[in-house]
Amino acid sequence: MVHPVQVGKRTRMSFSRLKEVGQMPNLIEVQLDSYDWFLKEGLQEVFDDINPIQDYTGNLNLEFVGYKLDLDSIKYSVEECKERDSTYAAPLKVKVRLLNKETGEIKEQEVFMGDFPLMTEQGTFIINGAERVIVSQLVRSPGVYYDMTVDKTGSKLFSATVIPNRGAWLEYETDSNNIIYVRIDKTRKLPITILARALGYGTDAEIIEFFGEDERLKATIEKDNTKTREEALLEIYKRLRPGEPPTVDSAESLIESLFFDAKRYDLSRVGRYKFNKKLAIHLRITNQIADQDIVNPQTGEILVQKGEKIDKDKAIEIQNCGINEVYIKIDDKSFKVIGNHFVDIHSLVPFDISDLNIKEYVFYPVLKEILDNYADEESIKEEIRKNIYRLIPKHIIREDIYATINYELGLSYDIGYKDDIDHLGNRRLRSVGELLQNQFRIGLSRMERVVKERMTIQDQEVITPQALINIRPVAASIKEFFGSSQLSQFMDQTNPLSELTHKRRLSALGPGGLSRERAGFEVRDVHHSHYGRMCPIETPEGPNIGLINSLATFAKVNEYGFIETPYRRIDPKNKRATNDIVYMTADEEDLYVIARSDEPIDENGYFIDDKVTVRAKEEVLVVPVSEVEYMDISPRQLVSVATAMIPFLENDDASRALMGSNMQRQAVPLLKPQAPIVGTGIEYKAATDSGVLPKAKNAGTVVYVSADEIRVRRDSDGGIDKYKLLKFKRSNQGTCINQRPIVSKGEVVAKETLLADGPSTDLGEIALGKNILMGFITWEGYNYEDAMLISEQLVKEDVFTSIHIEEYEAEARDTKLGPEEITRDIPNVGEEALKDIDERGIIRIGAEVRSGDILVGKVTPKGETELTAEERLLRAIFGEKAREVRDTSLRVPHGEAGIIVDVKIFTRENGDELPPGVNKLVRCYIAQKRKISVGDKMAGRHGNKGVISRVLPEEDMPFLPDGRPLQICLNPLGVPSRMNIGQVLEVHLGLAASKLGWHIATPVFDGAIESDIVDCLRKAGYSEDGKTVLYDGRTGEPFDNRVTVGYMYILKLAHLVDDKIHARSTGPYSLVTQQPLGGKAQFGGQRFGEMEVWALEAYGAAHTLQEILTVKSDDVVGRVKTYEAIVKGENIPEPGVPESFKVLIKELQALCLDVKVLNDDNQEIKLKESVDEDADELEVNIEGTENQPEEKEEKEKEDSDEYDDLREEDVEPDLEELSLDDLDLDDFGDEH
């Protein structure tokens, strides 16, 4: 039944039937926790890996002892960094110790290692003044993966890949002759026995003795032409280092360094964990028949007798007592199973070692050696600490390789299983911390080389750590990562939801990931292991579909980087749903049977039905209650935040829900935000976690509230907390950030209470659009193809008005001819144009500007021309004439207008940091109020998008029986074929709720059903079908049929017509082809392509066609002459030769063809290089204005149209797209 729920300061009527168990985690903890780990542990790991750096003689030893981020000496606050274009960072100080072994002298110093970018509380970084987000990357986890293919004859061929975190890959494959090959580090394949020999099993007999009798092994030995360990080593060396003289010693050291050297080969913690999980012997012997007695080597006790079945517990016991080889019986054959000899340390050490913090399995032979040699608790613990890298090796060991070969052999007997690489148990997340750690490691290893070189060069007596260390490579690699990595993205700040989603994004692209072109369908597909971890709905349309995903609402990332999702434990004894919550990774989840969250249970947690619908791996089954082990915790745990904000998601087709999720992120913040009448209840959580709203840091009482500051007196010590509110700031996307207080003086606030609303929030709930009275009705064809008809009331009352702020900057530089100057004194500019310019030459705040108006007056010195003798004489007599300058003022670009809201001035004198060569920098901010207009794109939350086709006067809109006119008319044909019925249910419920004065929460998969909506309509006094008679506003006659009318939540999207509309008469031309550029940013023309030419040909419009292909495009002389004719009012002259024809001839000549152009009399026509001498004579500048009205390519353009589009690898600039105006010619003086 519908019940009230308190959400922040608002009460919503909720239709949910389920009691939520467990809290949703903080939605940006992916970012915060990861960076936190990096500062606490990640940095230390890198230093540990590189310690100590020794010189080549082994005499000098440099060690990093400890480090600290100096948080007290941060230069600027976050806000100041944004204003000054600087990076929010803290200095990293590292304590370094230098030991000279000959003299025994130790020098310690604290060395500054560069400024380290800090994460803000919102999970972002400020890099050069721009707010950026580091997107988490989904990559294949290191480990060993087995695969199976079936060949032409129908036999199964198995292959395997051993993937480290870094280092050489090992790949096994079987051919149709049953020979097993290995590739080492992607080289040519060798029989696998060569590898086994090289690792220590030299003769055929030893190999068969160790691995057991096997047909494939024998076939491989036959193929193998080496017979001893030495031969095998030389063979491998020849393959890996062709052309070098092979010796046994060099071959041995090569294999050692390839696989068994922690600096060259790193499995990482995850890799070791996955290896031990896959190769553990207990998994492969469970439920098998023993072929020999299995005896505990310590006690001599028989664990399993020959012919007995091994159960799961016995198998684990066998592994943990150090047994690594077990014979089992398969189809009357004996097969030897070999593990990698890792055991659970807790089952072997007789006392508690939880303080050692060892969670992984450890290598048994090393542990046994420690336990055999030491008896007391303290020394055993001490030895374990000392030998931790031998117990848990970071690199692969011989036993691992033997176990992988044995697993490969066992697969043909159905022992073990093949892996699915798209399973989330085999893909992990690399978040900020790890990505940064890898980058830092690269920087440090570059630095290590420098340090070693300096150690050998410098005098060992006077050497200091400071003199050895060069921090440049470290600083450069960090800077490179934040500035240009594909995963470091300009934050999508259109609204709070787009910020939040950007921080929770998971990308499979980027360095070390996939590339768009290579990614097939399997990787992009929805997988059963995504349930509760990755949203199946929210992903971009286009080339990135399925490669960029979003984290599900309840998901967390564990220490290994695997995504976990929570489940309720079902008590195994009485099968009652408990409130214990267990987080599980995808491969753990596969072992259990899991019921859905909306399975009916009574108030004590017992299942009401005898049979229950469950998920088991990829299957959905119906099983008796006794088999259920876990239960989902919430119906919305499988979707992302944006998707969970679509009401009635369960009634929408998936592809439309996808558009709905994506379009909510493009909603522009409106002047007066309004929370949805029909919400889903997650709006408050999303807004509070997005980081755009100020929260109380401590509990207390509000003592002062104004538009831009709130003060709270703390309860704890009576001190005052001040909160500055952001007023009309520009976001990354040019939308407006403005915060408004929602607390009043005297109000008592708890810790974490919201104090103010931000952009697109209303009482702390995300409010992306407006509740609009609409009807599904066609009107005179203005609804055709999803177009929308809107009422003029929406324009008059500023319902969909938004504020947009653009930033423009002018810098005064030093040029060869002298410094540029910012001044009010500009040549050839009348007083009228300077009316809003102050005495400094800068526009005043509050001035209204249109395109072409001066924002900052600036003059640049012109080159002196050669003077004649007479002029020199006059100059000498009358003194220096004023030097020539030209006007290079910053003007409002074409098509822009608005009001100046802020001006910032940075100069060298004030001590501001400016780029070299810049003396003064002025930034102007122009705000525009954009009302809704024809051509703007609007959308609902169900993927129902459209463009406004007409703004109709209020009195002409269809109206209700009570006289209220509709605000929007939508096409009823937009619903049935698209199958997003959620919008219809939303409209009905919205109608009833607005009459009842309710705000509604209808959570996804647990919301209102049809009968609930009918009840609400009845309660509100409307007809049960939600339809009503509508009257035509023009005639007052009723329409023929009753129409569905109600309230729909509608968003205005960031595709505004003002940003797209564009017109050009003349402007810049491309350098080579001399054709006009394309696109609004280049102030380009409209493309007249091949098909358009056909159209004119078909009409026989010969003159129009000739004109378009010549004077309107690339006939350089013709276009000047035409312009002249128009100016002088004469007839248009005949066109000349288009430049592209000359380019074609040049291209043919470049192919060594002698091409001549002949006339009718076979006379050669000389094509002269067309120069604009005619233009100079005319003094007509048709190359656009001298300061080309090119919009300042803003910082955000670097992240192409869709912010999900991770930037392509560096794109070569297309020469044709560069126009002369694009080159910065100021640096070349005035020769041009």
Swiss-Prot record:
GO terms for biological process: DNA-templated transcription. Its EC number is 2.7.7.6. Signal peptide: none annotated. Coiled coil: none annotated. Residues 1189-1198 have a biased composition (Basic and acidic residues). Residues 1171-1180, 1199-1232 have a biased composition (Acidic residues). SUPFAM superfamilies: beta and beta-prime subunits of DNA dependent RNA-polymerase (SSF64484). InterPro entries: DNA-dir_RNA_pol_bsu_ext_1_sf, DNA-dir_RNA_pol_bsu_external_1, DNA-dir_RNA_pol_su2, DNA-dir_RNAP_su2_dom, DNA-dir_RNAP_su2_hyb_sf, RNA_pol_bsu_bac, RNA_pol_bsu_CS, RNA_pol_bsu_protrusion. Residues 1170-1232 are annotated as: Disordered. One of its GO terms (cellular component) is DNA-directed RNA polymerase complex. Keywords: DNA-directed RNA polymerase, Nucleotidyltransferase, Transcription, Transferase. It catalyses: RNA(n) + a ribonucleoside 5'-triphosphate = RNA(n+1) + diphosphate. The RNAP catalytic core consists of 2 alpha, 1 beta, 1 beta' and 1 omega subunit. When a sigma factor is associated with the core the holoenzyme is formed, which can initiate transcription. HAMAP family: RNApol_bact_RpoB (MF_01321). Belongs to the RNA polymerase beta chain family. This is DNA-directed RNA polymerase subunit beta. The lineage of its organism: Bacteria, Bacillati, Bacillota, Clostridia, Eubacteriales. The gene is rpoB.
